[in-house]
Amino acid sequence: MTQSLTIRRPDDWHLHLRDGAMLAAVLPETARHFARAIVMPNLVPPVVTGAQAAAYRDRILATLPKGMNFEPLMTLYLTEQTDPDDLAAAHTSGLITSVKLYPAGATTNSASGVKDFDKVRPVLERMAEIGCPLCVHGEVTDREIDIFDREAVFIDRVLDPIRRATPGLRVIMEHITTKDGADYVAANPEGLGATITVQHLMFDRNDMLVGGMRPHYYCLPILKRRHHREALVAAATSGDARYFLGTDSAPHPTHAKEAECCAAGCFTAPIALSCLAHVFEEAGALDKLEGFTSLNGPAFYGLPVNADTITLSKADPLDIPKTLPAGEHTVTVFDPGVPLHWRVTR
Protein backbone atom coordinates (compact mmCIF):
# COMPACT_ATOMS: atom_id res chain seq x y z
CA MET A 1 0.00 0.00 0.00
CA THR A 2 1.38 3.39 -1.03
CA GLN A 3 2.33 5.58 1.94
CA SER A 4 4.19 8.33 0.12
CA LEU A 5 3.85 9.96 -3.28
CA THR A 6 6.15 12.54 -4.89
CA ILE A 7 4.75 14.54 -7.79
CA ARG A 8 5.59 17.65 -9.76
CA ARG A 9 4.42 20.73 -7.92
CA PRO A 10 0.76 21.27 -8.88
CA ASP A 11 -1.03 24.23 -10.42
CA ASP A 12 -4.58 25.43 -9.86
CA TRP A 13 -6.30 26.30 -13.14
CA HIS A 14 -9.27 28.10 -11.54
CA LEU A 15 -8.90 30.12 -8.35
CA HIS A 16 -10.56 33.04 -6.58
CA LEU A 17 -8.15 35.16 -4.56
CA ARG A 18 -10.42 38.18 -3.99
CA ASP A 19 -8.72 41.42 -2.89
CA GLY A 20 -7.69 43.38 0.19
CA ALA A 21 -7.87 41.60 3.54
CA MET A 22 -9.39 38.49 1.99
CA LEU A 23 -6.55 38.25 -0.53
CA ALA A 24 -4.01 38.52 2.27
CA ALA A 25 -5.76 35.75 4.21
CA VAL A 26 -6.22 33.18 1.46
CA LEU A 27 -3.23 33.69 -0.85
CA PRO A 28 -0.77 31.78 1.39
CA GLU A 29 -3.12 28.78 1.48
CA THR A 30 -2.71 28.36 -2.28
CA ALA A 31 0.92 29.50 -2.60
CA ARG A 32 2.00 26.98 0.04
CA HIS A 33 1.35 24.06 -2.33
CA PHE A 34 0.62 25.40 -5.82
CA ALA A 35 3.17 27.02 -8.13
CA ARG A 36 0.71 28.83 -10.40
CA ALA A 37 -2.99 29.58 -10.59
CA ILE A 38 -5.42 31.02 -13.10
CA VAL A 39 -6.82 33.94 -11.10
CA MET A 40 -10.47 34.78 -11.64
CA PRO A 41 -11.29 38.38 -12.62
CA ASN A 42 -14.73 38.74 -11.00
CA LEU A 43 -13.80 41.45 -8.53
CA VAL A 44 -15.96 44.50 -7.88
CA PRO A 45 -15.42 46.21 -10.26
CA PRO A 46 -14.33 43.35 -12.55
CA VAL A 47 -10.94 43.11 -14.24
CA VAL A 48 -11.87 44.05 -17.81
CA THR A 49 -8.75 45.76 -19.20
CA GLY A 50 -5.08 44.98 -19.44
CA ALA A 51 -4.26 47.86 -17.11
CA GLN A 52 -6.63 46.48 -14.46
CA ALA A 53 -5.11 43.00 -14.83
CA ALA A 54 -1.62 44.43 -14.34
CA ALA A 55 -2.72 46.34 -11.25
CA TYR A 56 -4.39 43.25 -9.76
CA ARG A 57 -1.32 41.12 -10.46
CA ASP A 58 0.84 43.71 -8.70
CA ARG A 59 -1.45 43.63 -5.66
CA ILE A 60 -1.23 39.85 -5.52
CA LEU A 61 2.56 39.82 -5.75
CA ALA A 62 2.84 42.60 -3.16
CA THR A 63 0.67 40.52 -0.80
CA LEU A 64 2.58 37.26 -1.30
CA PRO A 65 4.45 36.39 1.92
CA LYS A 66 8.22 36.58 1.71
CA GLY A 67 9.81 33.26 0.81
CA MET A 68 6.78 31.89 -1.05
CA ASN A 69 7.13 31.14 -4.76
CA PHE A 70 3.88 31.62 -6.66
CA GLU A 71 2.94 32.95 -10.10
CA PRO A 72 -0.56 34.40 -10.64
CA LEU A 73 -1.78 33.76 -14.18
CA MET A 74 -4.07 36.66 -14.93
CA THR A 75 -7.36 36.72 -16.83
CA LEU A 76 -9.69 39.30 -18.29
CA TYR A 77 -13.42 39.37 -17.66
CA LEU A 78 -15.18 39.23 -21.05
CA THR A 79 -17.93 41.81 -21.55
CA GLU A 80 -19.91 42.98 -24.54
CA GLN A 81 -17.68 46.08 -24.52
CA THR A 82 -14.32 44.26 -24.43
CA ASP A 83 -11.76 45.94 -26.69
CA PRO A 84 -10.17 43.26 -28.93
CA ASP A 85 -6.98 45.31 -29.32
CA ASP A 86 -6.53 45.76 -25.57
CA LEU A 87 -7.14 42.05 -25.05
CA ALA A 88 -4.68 41.10 -27.79
CA ALA A 89 -2.00 43.39 -26.42
CA ALA A 90 -2.44 41.97 -22.91
CA HIS A 91 -2.17 38.40 -24.17
CA THR A 92 0.70 38.97 -26.58
CA SER A 93 2.73 40.67 -23.86
CA GLY A 94 2.20 37.75 -21.49
CA LEU A 95 0.18 39.84 -19.05
CA ILE A 96 -2.87 37.60 -19.30
CA THR A 97 -3.08 33.85 -19.85
CA SER A 98 -6.76 33.57 -20.76
CA VAL A 99 -10.13 35.33 -20.88
CA LYS A 100 -13.12 34.41 -18.73
CA LEU A 101 -16.66 34.18 -20.05
CA TYR A 102 -19.40 34.60 -17.46
CA PRO A 103 -22.99 34.49 -18.67
CA ALA A 104 -24.60 37.49 -16.97
CA GLY A 105 -26.03 36.47 -13.60
CA ALA A 106 -24.55 32.97 -13.55
CA THR A 107 -22.47 33.28 -10.38
CA THR A 108 -20.78 35.64 -7.90
CA ASN A 109 -20.13 39.11 -9.35
CA SER A 110 -21.23 38.13 -12.86
CA ALA A 111 -23.67 40.98 -13.51
CA SER A 112 -21.26 42.48 -16.05
CA GLY A 113 -21.11 39.22 -18.00
CA VAL A 114 -22.37 38.41 -21.47
CA LYS A 115 -26.07 38.49 -22.34
CA ASP A 116 -25.88 38.56 -26.15
CA PHE A 117 -23.21 36.15 -27.36
CA ASP A 118 -23.31 37.56 -30.88
CA LYS A 119 -21.87 40.80 -29.49
CA VAL A 120 -18.66 39.05 -28.38
CA ARG A 121 -18.16 37.05 -31.56
CA PRO A 122 -15.52 39.49 -32.97
CA VAL A 123 -13.57 39.22 -29.72
CA LEU A 124 -13.72 35.42 -29.81
CA GLU A 125 -12.51 35.42 -33.40
CA ARG A 126 -9.59 37.63 -32.42
CA MET A 127 -8.77 35.30 -29.54
CA ALA A 128 -8.70 32.34 -31.92
CA GLU A 129 -6.30 34.24 -34.19
CA ILE A 130 -3.83 35.03 -31.41
CA GLY A 131 -4.17 31.73 -29.53
CA CYS A 132 -5.75 33.14 -26.38
CA PRO A 133 -7.82 30.48 -24.56
CA LEU A 134 -11.38 31.10 -23.37
CA CYS A 135 -12.36 29.92 -19.88
CA VAL A 136 -16.11 29.35 -19.72
CA HIS A 137 -18.57 29.29 -16.84
CA GLY A 138 -20.90 26.88 -18.58
CA GLU A 139 -24.42 27.59 -17.40
CA VAL A 140 -27.41 29.28 -18.97
CA THR A 141 -29.25 31.72 -16.74
CA ASP A 142 -32.77 31.52 -18.19
CA ARG A 143 -35.23 31.34 -15.32
CA GLU A 144 -37.25 28.63 -17.06
CA ILE A 145 -34.25 26.28 -17.03
CA ASP A 146 -33.91 24.21 -13.87
CA ILE A 147 -30.69 24.98 -12.01
CA PHE A 148 -29.64 21.32 -12.20
CA ASP A 149 -29.96 21.37 -16.01
CA ARG A 150 -28.14 24.62 -16.76
CA GLU A 151 -24.83 23.05 -17.73
CA ALA A 152 -26.28 20.56 -20.20
CA VAL A 153 -28.44 23.24 -21.81
CA PHE A 154 -25.46 25.62 -22.04
CA ILE A 155 -23.47 23.04 -23.97
CA ASP A 156 -26.24 22.64 -26.55
CA ARG A 157 -27.40 26.24 -26.82
CA VAL A 158 -24.23 28.25 -26.33
CA LEU A 159 -20.94 26.37 -26.18
CA ASP A 160 -21.29 24.08 -29.16
CA PRO A 161 -22.46 26.93 -31.45
CA ILE A 162 -19.54 29.10 -30.27
CA ARG A 163 -17.04 26.35 -31.00
CA ARG A 164 -18.54 25.61 -34.41
CA ALA A 165 -18.50 29.30 -35.35
CA THR A 166 -14.94 29.80 -34.06
CA PRO A 167 -13.16 26.49 -34.74
CA GLY A 168 -9.67 27.72 -33.82
CA LEU A 169 -10.70 28.91 -30.36
CA ARG A 170 -9.24 26.91 -27.49
CA VAL A 171 -11.86 26.49 -24.76
CA ILE A 172 -11.71 25.37 -21.15
CA MET A 173 -15.03 24.21 -19.71
CA GLU A 174 -14.50 25.29 -16.14
CA HIS A 175 -15.73 23.33 -13.14
CA ILE A 176 -17.73 20.76 -15.11
CA THR A 177 -20.35 19.15 -12.91
CA THR A 178 -22.18 16.67 -15.11
CA LYS A 179 -21.70 13.53 -17.15
CA ASP A 180 -22.89 15.68 -20.05
CA GLY A 181 -19.89 17.95 -19.61
CA ALA A 182 -17.40 15.10 -19.26
CA ASP A 183 -18.85 13.33 -22.30
CA TYR A 184 -18.76 16.51 -24.40
CA VAL A 185 -15.04 16.90 -23.71
CA ALA A 186 -14.39 13.23 -24.45
CA ALA A 187 -16.18 13.53 -27.80
CA ASN A 188 -14.26 16.64 -28.90
CA PRO A 189 -10.53 15.92 -28.96
CA GLU A 190 -9.32 19.20 -30.46
CA GLY A 191 -8.96 22.45 -28.56
CA LEU A 192 -11.23 21.57 -25.63
CA GLY A 193 -10.34 20.89 -22.01
CA ALA A 194 -12.12 20.93 -18.67
CA THR A 195 -11.33 21.68 -15.05
CA ILE A 196 -12.92 19.78 -12.18
CA THR A 197 -13.21 20.94 -8.56
CA VAL A 198 -12.57 19.15 -5.30
CA GLN A 199 -16.16 19.41 -4.09
CA HIS A 200 -17.65 18.01 -7.29
CA LEU A 201 -15.37 14.98 -7.01
CA MET A 202 -16.28 14.38 -3.36
CA PHE A 203 -19.95 15.23 -3.04
CA ASP A 204 -23.31 15.11 -4.76
CA ARG A 205 -26.45 17.10 -4.03
CA ASN A 206 -27.61 14.67 -1.34
CA ASP A 207 -24.55 15.59 0.72
CA MET A 208 -25.63 19.23 0.56
CA LEU A 209 -29.37 18.79 1.12
CA VAL A 210 -30.29 15.58 2.98
CA GLY A 211 -30.77 16.08 6.71
CA GLY A 212 -30.51 19.85 6.45
CA MET A 213 -28.99 22.41 4.12
CA ARG A 214 -25.19 22.63 4.37
CA PRO A 215 -24.34 26.10 3.07
CA HIS A 216 -20.60 25.49 2.92
CA TYR A 217 -21.22 22.89 0.19
CA TYR A 218 -23.28 25.34 -1.85
CA CYS A 219 -21.45 26.48 -4.95
CA LEU A 220 -22.18 27.37 -8.55
CA PRO A 221 -22.47 25.32 -10.62
CA ILE A 222 -24.42 23.47 -7.96
CA LEU A 223 -23.67 19.88 -6.89
CA LYS A 224 -25.52 17.37 -9.05
CA ARG A 225 -26.77 13.76 -8.81
CA ARG A 226 -24.50 10.90 -7.78
CA HIS A 227 -24.08 9.51 -11.29
CA HIS A 228 -22.71 12.87 -12.41
CA ARG A 229 -20.15 12.86 -9.58
CA GLU A 230 -19.15 9.33 -10.52
CA ALA A 231 -18.64 10.42 -14.13
CA LEU A 232 -16.40 13.27 -12.97
CA VAL A 233 -14.30 10.93 -10.83
CA ALA A 234 -13.95 8.59 -13.81
CA ALA A 235 -12.83 11.47 -16.02
CA ALA A 236 -10.37 12.92 -13.49
CA THR A 237 -8.78 9.55 -12.73
CA SER A 238 -8.74 8.32 -16.34
CA GLY A 239 -5.37 9.78 -17.26
CA ASP A 240 -6.99 11.72 -20.13
CA ALA A 241 -4.96 14.93 -20.43
CA ARG A 242 -8.03 17.02 -21.30
CA TYR A 243 -9.17 17.00 -17.66
CA PHE A 244 -7.21 18.93 -15.04
CA LEU A 245 -7.55 20.53 -11.63
CA GLY A 246 -9.30 23.84 -11.14
CA THR A 247 -10.28 24.06 -7.48
CA ASP A 248 -12.59 27.05 -7.90
CA SER A 249 -11.67 27.70 -4.27
CA ALA A 250 -13.97 30.62 -3.52
CA PRO A 251 -13.69 32.22 -0.08
CA HIS A 252 -16.54 34.18 1.46
CA PRO A 253 -16.86 35.52 5.00
CA THR A 254 -18.50 32.90 7.19
CA HIS A 255 -21.45 35.19 7.90
CA ALA A 256 -22.13 35.44 4.14
CA LYS A 257 -22.20 31.65 3.85
CA GLU A 258 -24.30 31.07 6.96
CA ALA A 259 -27.06 33.42 5.86
CA GLU A 260 -30.70 33.29 4.83
CA CYS A 261 -29.60 33.78 1.23
CA CYS A 262 -26.05 32.45 1.29
CA ALA A 263 -23.13 33.13 -1.04
CA ALA A 264 -22.00 30.44 -3.47
CA GLY A 265 -18.52 28.98 -3.16
CA CYS A 266 -16.39 26.46 -1.28
CA PHE A 267 -13.06 27.44 0.27
CA THR A 268 -11.03 24.31 -0.49
CA ALA A 269 -7.52 25.69 -0.96
CA PRO A 270 -6.05 24.64 2.44
CA ILE A 271 -6.90 20.95 1.98
CA ALA A 272 -7.37 20.55 -1.78
CA LEU A 273 -4.45 18.18 -2.32
CA SER A 274 -5.34 16.07 0.71
CA CYS A 275 -8.89 15.73 -0.61
CA LEU A 276 -7.69 14.81 -4.09
CA ALA A 277 -5.30 12.17 -2.80
CA HIS A 278 -8.23 10.67 -0.89
CA VAL A 279 -10.45 10.64 -4.00
CA PHE A 280 -7.77 9.17 -6.25
CA GLU A 281 -6.81 6.52 -3.69
CA GLU A 282 -10.46 5.51 -3.31
CA ALA A 283 -10.62 5.16 -7.10
CA GLY A 284 -7.43 3.08 -7.19
CA ALA A 285 -5.76 5.76 -9.29
CA LEU A 286 -3.06 7.42 -7.19
CA ASP A 287 -0.75 6.98 -10.17
CA LYS A 288 -2.98 9.39 -12.12
CA LEU A 289 -2.93 12.17 -9.51
CA GLU A 290 0.19 13.87 -10.88
CA GLY A 291 -1.29 14.11 -14.36
CA PHE A 292 -4.51 15.68 -13.10
CA THR A 293 -2.85 18.18 -10.76
CA SER A 294 0.52 18.90 -12.35
CA LEU A 295 0.85 17.84 -16.00
CA ASN A 296 -2.42 18.11 -17.91
CA GLY A 297 -3.06 21.80 -17.29
CA PRO A 298 0.36 22.98 -18.49
CA ALA A 299 0.02 20.75 -21.55
CA PHE A 300 -3.30 22.34 -22.50
CA TYR A 301 -2.05 25.89 -21.95
CA GLY A 302 1.29 25.23 -23.64
CA LEU A 303 3.29 26.03 -20.51
CA PRO A 304 6.22 24.12 -19.00
CA VAL A 305 5.58 21.82 -16.07
CA ASN A 306 7.01 22.93 -12.76
CA ALA A 307 10.58 21.86 -12.05
CA ASP A 308 10.15 21.33 -8.32
CA THR A 309 8.17 18.60 -6.58
CA ILE A 310 6.02 18.05 -3.53
CA THR A 311 5.59 14.90 -1.47
CA LEU A 312 2.29 13.65 -0.08
CA SER A 313 2.50 11.25 2.85
CA LYS A 314 -0.16 9.10 4.49
CA ALA A 315 -0.42 9.18 8.27
CA ASP A 316 -2.91 9.83 11.07
CA PRO A 317 -5.94 11.98 10.14
CA LEU A 318 -5.16 15.56 9.24
CA ASP A 319 -6.14 18.20 11.78
CA ILE A 320 -8.22 20.59 9.67
CA PRO A 321 -8.84 24.11 10.99
CA LYS A 322 -12.50 25.06 10.98
CA THR A 323 -11.94 28.69 10.07
CA LEU A 324 -9.29 31.08 8.85
CA PRO A 325 -9.11 34.72 10.02
CA ALA A 326 -9.64 37.25 7.23
CA GLY A 327 -9.44 40.82 8.43
CA GLU A 328 -12.46 41.48 10.62
CA HIS A 329 -14.11 38.23 9.50
CA THR A 330 -13.43 34.52 9.24
CA VAL A 331 -13.60 32.11 6.31
CA THR A 332 -14.85 28.60 6.93
CA VAL A 333 -12.60 25.88 5.53
CA PHE A 334 -14.24 23.17 3.42
CA ASP A 335 -15.26 20.12 5.47
CA PRO A 336 -14.38 16.93 3.56
CA GLY A 337 -16.82 14.87 5.61
CA VAL A 338 -14.27 12.07 6.07
CA PRO A 339 -10.88 11.77 7.79
CA LEU A 340 -8.08 12.83 5.46
CA HIS A 341 -4.89 10.81 5.88
CA TRP A 342 -2.84 12.40 3.10
CA ARG A 343 -0.94 15.61 3.68
CA VAL A 344 1.82 17.57 1.95
CA THR A 345 5.03 16.89 3.88
CA ARG A 346 7.57 18.65 1.66
From Swiss-Prot:
Active site, per annotation: D248
Pfam families, sorted: Amidohydro_1
Enzyme class of the recorded protein, top EC level: hydrolase
CDD domains, alphabetized: DHOase (cd01294)
Any one of the GO CC terms: cytosol
Residues engaged in binding Zn(2+) 1: H14, H16, K100, D248
Cofactor note: Binds 2 Zn(2+) ions per subunit.
Positions of post-translational N6-carboxylysine modification: K100
Function: Catalyzes the reversible cyclization of carbamoyl aspartate to dihydroorotate.
Assembly and interaction partners: Homodimer.
Protein name: Dihydroorotase
EC numbers on record: 3.5.2.3
Domain of life: Bacteria
Pathway involvement of the protein, from the record: Pyrimidine metabolism; UMP biosynthesis via de novo pathway; (S)-dihydroorotate from bicarbonate: step 3/3
UniProt cross-references to HAMAP family, sorted A to Z: PyrC_classII (MF_00219)
Keyword Hydrolase: yes
Residue sites binding substrate per the record: H16, L17, R18, N42, H137, L220, H252, A264
SS bond partners: none
Annotated GO biological process: 'de novo' pyrimidine nucleobase biosynthetic process; 'de novo' UMP biosynthetic process
A GO MF label: dihydroorotase activity
Cofactor: Zn(2+)
Alphabetically ordered keywords of this record: Hydrolase, Metal-binding, Pyrimidine biosynthesis, Zinc
Listed InterPro entries: Amidohydro-rel, DHOdimr, Dihydroorotase_CS, Metal_Hydrolase
Reaction(s) catalysed (UniProt annotation): (S)-dihydroorotate + H2O = N-carbamoyl-L-aspartate + H(+)
